[in-house]
A protein has these predicted regions:
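Metal-associated gating/positioning segment near the N- to mid-region
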Residues: 1-48
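Metal-coordinating catalytic core of metallo-dependent amide/deamination hydrolases
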Residues: 37, 44-166
């Protein structure tokens, strides 16, 4: 269900889809959020729109764009570029209320080539990674069948795991 909705998001939608849960967070007393965002056909500048909403709401957040090969190599590359640009901006701005991680959707939606490129770019920037890991048996099964290793082994192979990874 979510993947179909993600594909329809515009940059304006990204702002408002962030603002609603930010308002809810304020009502519930939450002060810091970690978001793993996806809008495959509006990836570029999507994190800036979400950051704009976070700043307006007055909360703290760690944001990333979830890289995936679900919609092809171009959208995966756009996701990598969005993470790189946003991480660099956060590092330059040094805003204590806004941080960035390098987002990866999940091992079963990322090719080896994309995983390698994302790992290389993230490590070059000293970034941590945010990745869904073995959330279902199907993720383990897919990795064992297609890569002859389990999810965590594959993430380790590409040096995704570390003290800054969630």
């Amino acid at each position: 269900l979510w993947w179909r909705l993600d594909k329809k998001l515009t940059l304006e939608d990204c702002y408002y889809s962030a603002m609603l849960p930010l308002i809810d967070a304020i009502k519930r007393g939450t002060t810091t959020l970690i978001d793993h965002h996806a809008s495959p056909f509006a990836a570029r500048a999507s994190l800036d729109k979400i950051a704009e909403a976070v700043k307006k709401a007055g909360l703290r957040a760690s944001l990333c764009y979830e890289v995936s090969d679900r919609d092809g190599s171009k959208t995966a590359r756009d996701g990598i570029d969005e993470n790189v640009e946003f991480i660099k901006r956060c590092q330059e701005e040094k805003d204590e209320n806004l941080k960035a991680l390098f987002g990866l959707h999940a091992s079963f939606t990322i090719t080896d080539g994309t995983m390698e490129k994302a790992s290389e770019e993230g490590r070059k920037l000293g970034a941590g990674f945010h990745v869904h890991t073995a959330e279902a048996a199907s993720d383990q099964d897919y990795n064992e069948k297609n890569f002859s290793m389990r999810v965590v082994e594959r993430l380790d192979k590409f040096r995704i795991l570390g003290p800054k990874t969630i």
